[in-house]
Amino acid sequence: FGKSMVLHREPVAAIRKYVDEMGLETTIMYDMAHVLGLTGDHFQKPFQEGAEIVTGSTHKTFFGPQRGIVGVNYKKGELKYGLWETIESRAFPGSVSNHHLGTQLGLLMAAYEMNQFKDAYQAAVVSNAKSFAKSLKAAGLDVAGDPAIDYTETHQVIVNVGYGAG
């Protein structure tokens, strides 16, 4: 899962249920780059819904410096925990050549702020996007999404302007 334009929750629970019913040995990964700051009661809880790996960006709806995160829902001793160990050992040093220590304090402060204010922040972000979408529609614009839920479940609003016209 994961994409740049996100109006709705991803069907993580439905996919988890399907692969489990089919007996498929699979790993569900959810790239939450654009919606990481909405994770929780106001949007989606991917680990509780069945995702095993979550990646994200700390500079979009999570309002910190430009960094990335990887988290897993594996416990030490489980067979798939080896996947986490591989990811962890190859991230730094390895694929990442600079861990940018100068941004870590900013990320820490953003994390503290998110922990303190996330409920109000997340609710406001989604509410503002819904209000914006309704206002655009009322002004005559072609707003994408389901009007029954005010067009969006996230921070994003999409306006159809025509192919290659926007």
What is the predicted function of each stretch?
Residues 143-166:
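Conserved PLP-binding catalytic core of the aspartate aminotransferase-like
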